[in-house]
Amino acid sequence: MTNIRKTHPLTKILNNTFIDLPTPSNISSWWNFGSLLGLCLIMQILTGLFLAMHYTPDTSTAFSSVAHICRDVNYGWFIRYLHANGASMFFICLYAHIGRGLYYGSYMFQETWNIGVLLLLTVMATAFVGYVLPWGQMSFWGATVITNLLSAIPYIGTTLVEWIWGGFSVDKATLTRFFAFHFILPFIITALAAVHLLFLHETGSNNPTGIPSNMDMIPFHPYYTIKDILGALFLILTLLALTLFAPDLLGDPDNYTPANPLSTPAHIKPEWYFLFAYAILRSIPNKLGGVLALLLSILILIFIPMLQTSKQRSMMFRPFSQLLFWTLIADLLTLTWIGGQPVEHPYIIVGQLASILYFFLILVLMPTVSLIENKLLKW
């Protein structure tokens, strides 16, 4: 008798996705981040659901409702900090996942890659609207500054900003709609993640060498289920350590002050995971130019497959490309640091140089070095 796992319409889908899925035999721990992102998403939806049971999306009570969650709700403080730090873990996994894709040439699966870029944008939007909800100083001013960037769009900009705000400033209507967006977007992310997996399983996974994977495949279960569980344990351990020992390490102290439209914080800055893009935005003195650079810093990922000039898919055997890749990572870390600094000398010039280097590396240096490496293959 055939196993019900392989015949029942529902279990058949799960079986072909998580159990009998043919997987390359040599994928490293860098391939763990996909499942970790799934775990992060589930944790964020669950903790968010419990927070939403006690939160009130109203300007007069939002801040105190978060304080109420932390003080009066059973384990409310724990759920709140799991959710806040869970977002940080989400972005760490997300950036590692994208970095792995860049390093090993996974972007050559173009449909999977493009859905991935769309997922990144959706997660960033979710994190942004979520940061506004506690209605602290940084929530309010972050929302004001970032939504105001849309006013740089010629002709329709100001109208668009007021339409998003639901008034002439960030107020009650803005908070209510941001809560609605923050609630619905994770479910859209879940649907997109399913499509992401669908496209991935059409081609099968890439592997560190970059050569076709169908030479040597093994079933996903038990080999990679056990490996993913190990990764998940590391993730949960890190998240718990962060939540229980240093819950405010990655947050901003200004957000413990209730939102006040009459008092601007000394340094308005987003959460750490947006700082690299914020630094690129600030490095251009022109408003529209800055907004375009900000958009391009993320959307440049869509053009990566078109910039592939190497005959080899992976960087595993390309030392010069490896050097440039790690230079790019160092540059992104520099931008992250600059994004958190005040706008003064020497941070301004460092930010401008790091921004130029970011685009120059991706658009010029990496494709050129790949062509040189192609020549070296013939030696």
From Swiss-Prot:
Pfam families: Cytochrom_B_C (PF00032), Cytochrome_B (PF00033). CDD domains: cytochrome_b_C, Cytochrome_b_N. Keywords: Electron transport, Heme, Iron, Membrane, Metal-binding, Mitochondrion, Mitochondrion inner membrane, Respiratory chain, Transmembrane, Transmembrane helix, Transport, Ubiquinone. Heme b b566 binds at H97, H196. InterPro entries: Cyt_b/b6_C (IPR005798), Cyt_b/b6_C_sf (IPR036150), Cyt_b/b6_N (IPR005797), Cytb/b6-like_sf (IPR027387), Cytochrome_b (IPR030689), Cytochrome_b_C_euk/bac (IPR048260), Cytochrome_b_N_euk/bac (IPR048259), Di-haem_cyt_TM (IPR016174). Belongs to the cytochrome b family. It comes from Cephalorhynchus eutropia. The chain crosses the membrane at residues 33-53, 77-98, 113-133, 178-198, 226-246, 288-308, 320-340, 347-367. Binds 2 heme b groups non-covalently. Its cofactor is heme b. GO terms for molecular function: metal ion binding; ubiquinol-cytochrome-c reductase activity. The keyword Transferase does not apply. Heme b b562 binds at H83, H182. Heme 1 (or BL or b562) is low-potential and absorbs at about 562 nm, and heme 2 (or BH or b566) is high-potential and absorbs at about 566 nm. This is Cytochrome b. It is a multi-pass membrane protein. The cytochrome bc1 complex contains 11 subunits: 3 respiratory subunits (MT-CYB, CYC1 and UQCRFS1), 2 core proteins (UQCRC1 and UQCRC2) and 6 low-molecular weight proteins (UQCRH/QCR6, UQCRB/QCR7, UQCRQ/QCR8, UQCR10/QCR9, UQCR11/QCR10 and a cleavage product of UQCRFS1). This cytochrome bc1 complex then forms a dimer. Component of the ubiquinol-cytochrome c reductase complex (complex III or cytochrome b-c1 complex) that is part of the mitochondrial respiratory chain. The b-c1 complex mediates electron transfer from ubiquinol to cytochrome c. Contributes to the generation of a proton gradient across the mitochondrial membrane that is then used for ATP synthesis. It is found in: Mitochondrion inner membrane. A ubiquinone binds at H201. GO terms for cellular component: mitochondrial inner membrane; respiratory chain complex III. PROSITE patterns: CYTB_CTER, CYTB_NTER. One of its GO terms (biological process) is mitochondrial electron transport, ubiquinol to cytochrome c.
